[in-house]
Amino acid sequence: MILYIVLPFYVRTKPYSILPSYSSLQWITNAWCSLPSIYILCHCSKHQEEITILALKPLIAMNNSEEWPLKHVQPPKLSFRHLLSRSVTDAPSLRVRWFYAVDRPLRKSRTGPTEIKKAKNFLPFSAEDSEHIEKSYLKAVENDGQSEPVNVNEDYLYSVNVVSRELSPIYWDGPVYRILRGTWFFSRGDKLYPCEENLATQVEEGYLNSCPYREFSNEKDSAAAQSKTWALLGRYTGGFVQYTGSRNARLVYDDFYRNVSVKIMNRFSPASFHRSDKLVRGYELDMLESNSKPSTPVPTEELTSTTLLNDSSDPSDNFTPSNTESTIDLPSATDASHLMSRPDREVNHLILCCHGIGQKMGERVETVSFVKDISNFRKTLKKTFNSSPDLQAVYPKLKGGGNGVQCLPLLWRQDIRFGMARDLDSSFADDDDDDDESLNMSRDLALDDLEDDSIPTLDNINIPTVTGLRNIISDVLLDVLLYCQPNYRDKILAAVVKRLNRLYNLYKKNVPSFNGHVSLLGHSLGALILFDIIRYQGNIKYSKLQLDFPVANFFALGSPLGLFQMLNGKKIAGPIPKTNLTRSLSYSEQSFDSGVSILSCQNFYNIFHPTDPISYRVEPLVVKQMARLKPQKISHFRPHQDLSSSGVGHKIAGGALNVLSGLRSGIANTLILKSLSYASVFNEATADSHDESQGAENIRDWHIDERMYRLNKTGRIDFMLQEGALDTSYSYVSAMNAHSEYWKNVDLAHFILTQLL
C-alpha cells in the first residue's frame, strides 16, 4: 500500500524534516510509518504539472534537532532544491561559489571532537576549485550522497568532502574546516556576504517558483516586483523575500509581524517597522571586475553552513540575517583573474621537513605548530623568489608560476607514546589501501607488561606533583634523552621512515607528473633523525630504514648533530668515489665501518643562527683543519624594491643573463675563494716546493678539499646566518628566540633557493 499526500507547490521541505507550519502531517506519517513508501506530490497549477518531490521509505515528520527514528532505514540524502531547479528550464544559470572557513575549525584533527563554536571568517575558493567542487556536489546528489574528494587550493594540499562540507589537509593530520556553498549573497556596498545555506535554499526555491526573471527581464515592472514575495519558514519564520529583478531580491524580516500576513505587511506596514537586506543571486564575474579591494575575511557574528547534503541547518546556531557579518571582500581585478584561472605550477623540488623537540606540546599549546612553521616557510620561499630579480632572471620560466619548490611537514612525535599504556590508532590508517602502509603504532614503546619482572613505564615512575612543569619536560627535553637510548631510537627512526615514504608516495599519487628531486630538511632533533636515516641508506643491515627515493640535498637547521657525532667518536664523510685516484686518498674500508658516518646524499648543509644555543658545527668532523676557518656567512638578501629604488635593479635585470648564467656552477668557486683561507697557502706551496716532504703536504691539503666536496658542491658545509643590530647588542635575549626563527628568515629562504634551482 502506498500513501500519496498532495500538497500545494509552494510547500518547501527537506528529507525527513517537515517544516513547522505543516506539523499537522505528523499524525499521518506516524499512523502510516509501516507503509513501504510515502510520496509527496506537489501540484503546480501555474505550470499544470505534478512533480514528485520526495519518495521516502518512510517519511517521518520531525524537527531538525531530532534523530532519524528508524534505525533499519537509511535517511535519504536527495536534495529537494536540486529536483526543483530541474523542473524550471528557463531560469538563468546560477553561478555558484564555494567558500571555506579560516578562523575556527570544525575539529582540531581528523578524529578529534567537533568544536561547538562556529566559524566566522570565510574566503572564496578559486574559480577552478569552486567549479570542481560544484561538479562533485552535483554528482553526489545524483549518486545519493556518494562522492570523491576534491583536491583544492595552492598545489592541492587540501581535500574537500562535499557531503560532510569539510576541508582537511591531505599530507598531515591537521584542523578540519567548514566549507559553504554560496548561491545567494547579501550585497552591502562593494562586499558580498554569502547567505547561510538553509536560507539560500529557501530564497532560491521562491525564485524558481515566482520566476521574476520572466517579468523583469527589462527591469521596468516595479509594481509586479511588490507582488513577487516569498515567505520564509523554519528558523526564518516572520521574514519574507521580495524579488526585485532578474537576479536581485530584498530580504525583509521583523518579529513584530511574525504572525501577520505577508500581503498585509507589504501593503500597510511602514517601512521603518521592519528591516531589509539586498540579495544578489550568484557570484557574478562583473561584480568581481567592478571591485578594487582584495579578498580578505571579515569577522561575523553568526554564520553556519550545512554539514549534510540535504542542506539541513543546525538549530542551535541562532542564525538571523541581521547578524550576518561574514563578509567576503571581493578581490581586485588582478586577483579576480587569478581566481577565475589558476595554472598548475611546476614543482621541480620536493622538500620533506622533519620537526625536532617540543612538538608534543602542540597538543596542549596551539601556538606550537610545525605545520604552521612550514606554512610560513613555504610563504617565505614564494615571497623571496617573487622579489628576487637574480633568481627570476636565471629561471624566467618559473616567474609568475611559483618557485618550483614544494615543502611538506612530517609529523612523527604523535606516533610515539613513551610510557602510555594504551593503543594509538594512526590518523592516517584509513588513507592507505593496505595494512602495511598504515602507521598504526598500537604497541607502546615503554614495553608495558603486566609481569612483575617487566620494565616499568614512564607513568609508573612519574611523581604526580608539579604536573605542568613535568609535562613540559616530558614533551620537550625527554625527546632528546630517549633518542639516545637504542630501543626508543630504533622505534623513532622506523616511524619517521614510514612517514617519509608515505608522504613521497602520496605526493606522487596526487601529482603523477612530478619527476624532480627530493630533499630532506630537519630542524633541531629532526636533523639528527634524518642524518641517521641518510647514513643508513644502501646498507642491507638496515633494510627497514630504506627510503623509496634518493636524497638530493639535506638541510640541517639549528642542529645538535655535530655534538652527538663528537660524543659518539664518529667523523662524517660523503659517498665513496669510484675512481682509483680518489680511492687511494680516501678512508680505509675499516675506518668506514667503525668511526665514520657516510651520508648518501649529493649535498649536506648545516645552517644555523650564531646565537642559536642548540646548533653546532660539523666541518671539523669532516676535516679537523676546518676548525681554523669561520663558518661561511649567508649574505643578506636585498628584495627587488630595495634594488630598484637605487637603480641597481635595472642593471641586474639587464645583465642578469650574462652575469648569473653560471650561478649554479660558479657559486661553489665563489664561496671557496672567499672562505677557504688555506687555498692561497696551497698555491704558494705548489709554486715554491721542490722537495718530497713539501709535495706530501700539498697532497694532504688537496685531500682536505676533496673530502669537503664529497659532501657539498660548494666545498663548505657550515653556513651561518648573519646577526642583526639587535642580535649583536642583546645576544642573550636573541638566543631565546633564535632556535625557532628560521622559518620566516628571507636570507635563509634565498640561500636555499639558490642551492636548489
From Swiss-Prot:
FT transit peptide: 1-13
Chain segments annotated as transmembrane: none
GO cellular component terms listed in the entry, alphabetical order: cytoplasm; mitochondrion
Biased amino acid composition, Polar residues: 302-329
Active site location: 524
Region (Disordered) location: 289-330
Record family assignment: Belongs to the PA-PLA1 family.
Record-given protein name: Probable phospholipase C20G8.02, mitochondrial
Organism name: Schizosaccharomyces pombe (strain 972 / ATCC 24843) (Fission yeast)
Classification lineage: Eukaryota, Fungi, Dikarya, Ascomycota, Taphrinomycotina
